[in-house]
Amino acid sequence: MPIVGNAGAGSVGAKPGSWLPEWKRIVVLLGSWTLGVRENEKGSGSRLIKWNGSGSREQKICKTTLPLFQACIKHLNSRDLLSTKVLTLALYKYILRAPQTAPHPPAAPPRTEVASSTAGRASRTKSASSTGRVSRANPASFHRPRLLRQAGLHLRRPRLSRQAGLRCHRLHLSAPSRSPTPPPNAVAPSSCSRLPRARLAIRGRRASSHSATVDTACSRRHSCDCLNRHRHLAVVATSAVAATTVAVPTACLCCGQIPLGRHRHNQAVTGRDLTVAALVLLAEVARETTGYSNGAPDPAAVVAISCCRPGSIPPSTAAAGSCRRHPAAVTARWPLAGGARSGRRDNPRRQGTGATRTGISKTYVSSVVAKTLALQELKGNIRVFCRVRPLLPNESGAVAYPKSGENLGRGIELTHNGQMYFFTFDKVFEQSTSQEDVFIEISHLVQSALDGYKVCIFAYGQTGSGKTYTMMGNPELHDQKGLIPRSLEQIFQTSQALISQGWKYKMQASMLEIYNEAICDLLATNHTTIQDGGASKYSIKHDANGNTHVSDLIIVDVLSINEVSSLLKRAAQSRSVGRTQMNEESSRSHCVFTLRFFGVNEGTDQQVQGVLNLIDLAGSERLNKSGATGDRLKETQAINKSLSCLSDVIFSIAKKEEHVPFRNSKLTYLLQPCLGGDSKTLMFVNLSPEVSSTGESICSLRFAARVNSCEIGIPRRQTQVRSLAQG
């Protein structure tokens, strides 16, 4: 792993004792080389001694910069968790640094700053007496590519900086002593195996342009998975100064890559030249941005605002952040370090040392909350999670997963007939993933139903791939509970906790199945299936607000989790299940569980209406494999037809056709608000890892990739203020 320091750039092959210009010295320690420091006899400098097994080489280093390099090496040696890519980038930026003599830092500075500047600045020369910088003699000899090759690095200058129009990028590697102190009961960030702590500051081309600084940290080992192509901590926020969106792209700390993007800020709206806009979410803004409206703390991932303009920022701006999985562990409060002062709105270049800059306090980012922000950033795309069931004892697997890089936790590979197929989704769960870990990824989506959103989660895949286990599981065993019972437990726990904040909820549950293109009520006491000669009397209707109603369907008011659990148990006994050659207990129908919320805040008279749809689709299967005959053959044909209609709908939405054939089947017509409305929709694609099912798995993954590309519109919250007549 490379370590950043300072030595002669032309030291390779240089004579011992040769003095190189200060601006041409770098320190590179690669591989297993060890660093030693020996003071010069005259006390004017030091020599770096590097051993590589075959001998040693001495490199001259300036005495004034020695403490900084010692602290850097000491710090980086203790931070073995840092990604090689991050360190390589840091070393590269240090080589491109403007030549200057570093001041005397403390003996062990808490943070090492690695900076870079453009080559244009290197062409300017100033006297050392007036500026404190060393004169840059013969700047043409400063050949960066040669320095990189001598350093053992073979990389190009990042094109990202030119694309972003940025002049300076600073990468701060925070030392453990200066890192945010974890709240009680939180796992130390240093114990995380994949997520180091880092800080990325992006500064614009001009002094009056905008900058952003975001501190990041990991609180739990399980919560550092990459999301949405290097957007693990990419935050789209609303400014507290004015209602202006500011995009702050940051480093993906799981893989170390830094996707720098354009930093946009609408000056026409604010009327201010913000130099620093490292804000993210205030509590009141988070309600509309992330869908959390039921009291504080709202899920504010980073709360820090700084501006070069005096009087722009309130002095006590602060907010709290919470993690839905470990609320006690990562809930914290981060006030700004220092308040804003009133003053003139002059150009920062003319303000000089008198310019007031509000300091940014320590910010503690919960990765779980960052995932919620990434979830809201998708502009209405259907989220797709992939889950692979475990292998049975007599099966051989054909599924692999990336072990590193940007697709870690998001990619899946299948080999079929000697050809490899690779797919990426928002999340991929391996065979060993537990039910609890799966639910954690969708818990925020379930929570948003209480805030007045329409939420739909459905499972898709071939028969025997684990759809019913994912959605329902075994409610009798805690570790095997599926998404439906876990979602209900969370909803009732949250609704009870919100009573103290003035919220009261009314909940109604219903459950139906679509069997052979006919709707059956699973909560009816005299349940009669189509195979017993019963006739379907239920019809689907959609109102003007996009809500779905099924005529004559039994809707039960539920007051506790026990009541809902008994309803689920009764519905499971009524569902159509059959045995095929591919599955001993194959679901022969599409099952839809619906929970409606009606909430009122007695203090603010605010009303919300939310809907949670949890759907377990029947599995697709090939007739030659299932061996279906008689009723099973008819069921298989009906299942495949409805899933084919679902595929037609998805293709029409993806192509943005004017007509979408929702009415071609009962399933697609029932899902119309979820697929073509303002709902938050998530699809699970379940796979069987065995070799014999690879063909069906590839078909499912292709369909899931098409679903993931569909834009169904931005989710809309159903809320209003209660009138006096209603009260």
Swiss-Prot record:
- Which keywords describe this protein according to UniProt? ATP-binding, Microtubule, Motor protein, Nucleotide-binding
Q: Which GO terms describe its biological process?
A: microtubule-based movement; spindle assembly
Q: Which InterPro entries match?
A: Kinesin-like_fam, Kinesin_motor_CS, Kinesin_motor_dom, Kinesin_motor_dom_sf, P-loop_NTPase
Compositional bias (Polar residues) at which positions? 114-133
Give the start-end ranges of region Disordered. Answer: 100-156, 172-194, 336-357
Please name the Gene3D superfamilies in this protein's record. Answer: Kinesin motor domain
Instruction: List residues of the Kinesin motor domain.
Output: 381-710
Name this polypeptide is given: Kinesin-like protein KIN-14G
CDD domains in the cross-refs: KISc_C_terminal (cd01366)
Tell me yes or no: is Isomerase among this UniProt entry's keywords.
no
The residues the record assigns to binding ATP are 461-468
Q: Which GO terms describe its molecular function?
A: ATP binding; ATP hydrolysis activity; microtubule binding; microtubule motor activity
Which SMART domains does the UniProt record give?
KISc (SM00129)
